[in-house]
């Protein structure tokens, strides 16, 4: 329970820092709120794993896997694939670079302010959950599908290149 309380305190602190910084003009809407789609190409320059490629490569795998899982589970595959396409794009924004604890939260914000469907923004945020023991699970079906797809990709990929949990 104390771990959850600590995480909530950290998240609250990060959100308060974000609000303080934005009020002083650290982050301007025009520069940082570019549509997430425009940031997807930049994922090519971020290494996910030296044998598994870039975050763009991971994103491409997530699109495929999320679509497959969505069809198996009778969920909107287009929404799941769109969320998969955008879910890592906030990692290359200045805001998440400065405040890494806001990954996913900012992804949802950028998605909804970039006129993506609310369900897509929610799935983007939720796919990081649970972040730690005791954290909330994704509440939307698309969020659960994307969260599972992300973990499947990481686990299978890392096992495939001979990396195992210690």
What are these regions (language model features)?
Residues 1-166:
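Amphipathic alpha-helical "coupling" segments that flank catalytic cores
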